């Protein structure tokens, strides 16, 4: 699924919007990034947005048939929490340490709750055509841009360290990924 140059320019304009939050408008472009968001060589790709659950609304779910190492297809779903490209990931605490912004922490928290709900929900598995609950995965958080990594600029190496530490200690077990909207934009650029 390839974007035209005009479609990509419209997407990029949403990301570059300086003030208004454009999360919902950007959401529609994520299906074009399936190759980035899903592992392997996915087929029969479908997406669901704003999927209602006990805790709220799951922003983005992408499901696909994925070929495994024994050459068998099985259906998998990946759950993503979105925050606007206009959100920052980190803010400065001290000269050498950053902490996640309220938006970033909220995204992680929502993602964990939505994932936990989906794994235990037989109706969700039925709607997504998932047989095994182990085939429901945390996809990740899509938030901000590289330019909005750190609120107010400043010590960018400290912000990168803060993200690296989270990726090293918090995320590996469930393979949670943190992507920026400009990463998505670069991937879908025609």
Language-model regions, residue ranges each:
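Charged, terminal alpha-helix-loop-beta segments
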Residues: 1-190
């Amino acid at each position: 699924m390839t974007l035209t140059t005009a479609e990509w320019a419209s997407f990029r304009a949403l990301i570059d919007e300086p003030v208004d939050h454009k999360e919902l408008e950007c959401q529609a472009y994520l299906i074009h990034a399936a190759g980035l968001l899903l592992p392997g060589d996915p087929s029969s790709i479908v997406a669901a947005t704003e999927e209602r659950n006990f805790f709220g609304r799951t922003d983005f779910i992408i499901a696909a048939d994925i070929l495994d190492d024994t050459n068998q297809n099985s259906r998998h779903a990946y759950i993503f929490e979105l925050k606007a490209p206009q959100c920052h990931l980190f803010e400065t605490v001290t000269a050498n340490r950053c902490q996640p912004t309220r938006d970033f922490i909220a995204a992680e928290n929502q993602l964990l709750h939505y994932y936990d709900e989906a794994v235990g929900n037989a109706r969700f598995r039925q709607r997504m055509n998932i047989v095994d609950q182990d085939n429901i995965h945390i996809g990740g958080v899509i938030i901000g841009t590289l330019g909005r990594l750190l609120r107010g600029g400043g010590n960018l190496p400290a912000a990168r360290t803060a993200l690296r530490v989270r990726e090293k200690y918090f995320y590996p077990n469930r393979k949670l990924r943190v992507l920026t909207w400009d990463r998505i934009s670069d991937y879908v650029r025609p």
